[in-house]
Amino acid sequence: MAYGWWRRRRRRWRRWRRRPWRRRWRTRRRRPARRRGRRRNVRRRRRGGRWRRRYRRWKRKGRRRKKAKIIIRQWQPNYRRRCNIVGYIPVLICGENTVSRNYATHSDDTNYPGPFGGGMTTDKFTLRILYGEYKRFMNYWTASNEDLDLCRYLGVNLYFFRHPDVDFIIKINTMPPFLDTELTAPSIHPGMLALDKRARWIPSLKSRPGKKHYIKIRVGAPKMFTDKWYPQTDLCDMVLLTVYATAADMQYPFGSPLTDSVVVNFQVLQSMYDEKISILPDEKIQRQNLLTSISNYIPFYNTTQTIAQLKPFVDAGNAISGTTTTTWGSLLNTTKFTTTTTTTYTYPGTTNTTVTFITANDSWYRGTVYNQNIKDVAKKAAELYSKATKAVLGNTFTTEDYTLGYHGGLYSSIWLSPGRSYFETPGAYTDIKYNPFTDRGEGNMLWIDWLSKKNMNYDKVQSKCLISDLPLWAAAYGYVEFCAKSTGDQNIHMNARLLIRSPFTDPQLLVHTDPTKGFVPYSLNFGNGKMPGGSSNVPIRMRAKWYPTLLHQQEVLEALAQSGPFAYHADIKKVSLGMKYRFKWIWGGNPVRQQVVRNPCKETHSSGNRVPRSLQIVDPKYNSPELTFHTWDFKRGLFGPKAIQRMQQQPTTTDIFSAGRKRPRRDTEVYHSSQEGEQKESLLFPPVKLLRRVPPWEDSQQEESGSQSSEEETQTVSQQLKQQLQQQRILGVKLRLLFNQVQKIQQNQDINPTLLPRGGDLASLFQIAP
């Protein structure tokens, strides 16, 4: 047969091989070649008619190279079990006009009716939080941790599900410390987060169709975390990662299409309120003088709020002048616009500034709608409603002050409502206009003052939560929630007020002669005498204490936050960002072998594999080596006395259901400086100072003789004993914690202090006194 006819087909190209620089896996770095000296001379000789090169072969003297690193190995427990914690959570839920709120702080709220949640979040994840989600039926564990007191953390896979209409931006942080500062919330604003190279966009299905409906992100262990076996109690409160997320708008990044301008408008109190802003009872006389000055200024009554606040009081026959009852018609100005006679009024809060109005009732030509008799009605209405509130609430209402009343007080809608009969005759406020794209942040200041503060100036001690040199649209993002966490007051929206200083508004919110002067803004609904959201149902207690607080200033912060670039404009009633997580753990330990024997002839049900497997999950807080039986505790078929004594100290669980935490566990902690911590502790209990050892070159009697003698005279013996007992108790607690930390270090179970929660590191043990 002609086998030569079928010749082998030649390759027209070389055989494919992988290029070394295109390998899938990274190769190990090659050790550099040893440098050799100059080549020796070669002696050649002719043999057999041909020349042959000849070398002198020397024996190379080698040297053993030392290892640069050694591998430290750790013996693993006898029993190991992999566990995946899989669950679903809403990263954030944003209701209508709640863009500037922090969802992590409001995730457990029960307020209804009204919008829920917030447009940004600062979530953290710990093993305790994962167990809490398991108790809420929000996740499942693939393996039980019962009797396995050791654990290893391997990382997590996150799956973010894309929304049909709304875009999101997320940022995952694994670098400790996992604490909030005054710059955390502003950095999560979409305008700031869009410039972060570590941020990840979660586009909506409308913005990017045709792609997967989820985005997967693999996250490793935290930085500076050593991968080894730890007791579950040590990793229970260690922060594994934090997720920063915010709603954004990629289709309309520079303003909503439903508005015709990007300029924000709001109102601030005029300078007449500067020294009368406090609500303390000892400032009541100054408030009464200011209220009299405001109520005597007749042009302030040129608004429809005068009818809403005073007409029901007059129609009920409560306005009595002498023996006659005043009617509403007798309060109106009946002078026709046929004369040019004028009337001069002294502007409230001043003694020399006068304003001229015509005597006629045409408000379009600087006339007054009401006559001089209206100025007494507001005060009478405020006094009557204040006494009625006292009678209704009884002893539970102790602060009766008509100057802070709803109908005719200092902050009544009669003086502060922006809707005037003529726009050129405003009330006791100033209209402010703000363009977010002209704000450079230089000179901006945002802080809060307690309601008892007597002025509007910034004070380093009394003022709190200062954010400076940032654009107002970024500083307003998540500001109220940061103030609540920083001060520790969960009711701060009723106990503090917001102040703003900015040179980028029109007119400028600053005083050049007083750089610390601030201005108090308020929302449109507060000026109209309504609750946030536009509801007219004002509670009776709030009607007796009607003054600007953070509750009535939140809408101003909301408008400022929504004016920034890429901000979500709350065009939908409610949006949410869903997330699936898969935390990877390994449980380990040396448990006692338990043999469970069941009756093979009796089965309660026969359902095959359709019934989900039930797992016994133990709280990691109590799953410690001290509260677990091990193989070495079991000898000769019995448990040892030490093991039984150790297990008897196990705390028992109570069946009392608590009302829940005031703040969700998923919300991140806030960073406190040492000075702020000392101030807080001094408010809670008297300071306890450690005795300082006096060097031999100092004379302690000369330095402390005066102070000690005065203190000993004022304090009794019992007070000194109580203070010493308190000092000894605190020192005992600190020493026990210190010995516990030293023992963990000796057992190679120590964790980096930056990964521990606040107060769990060694540095916090010595913060007793300066």
Curated annotation (Swiss-Prot):
The keyword Chloroplast does not apply. Residues 645-682, 697-717 are annotated as: Disordered. One of its GO terms (cellular component) is T=1 icosahedral viral capsid. It is found in: Virion. Its main location: virion. GO terms for biological process: DNA replication. Residues 703-717 have a biased composition (Low complexity). Pfam families: TT_ORF1. Residues 666-681 have a biased composition (Basic and acidic residues). It comes from the Viruses. Keywords: Capsid protein, DNA replication, T=1 icosahedral capsid protein, Virion. InterPro entries: TTvirus_Unk. Residues 646-656 have a biased composition (Polar residues). Belongs to the anelloviridae capsid protein family. May self assemble to form an icosahedral capsid. Presumably essential to initiate and monitor viral genome replication by a rolling circle mechanism. This is Probable capsid and replication-associated protein.
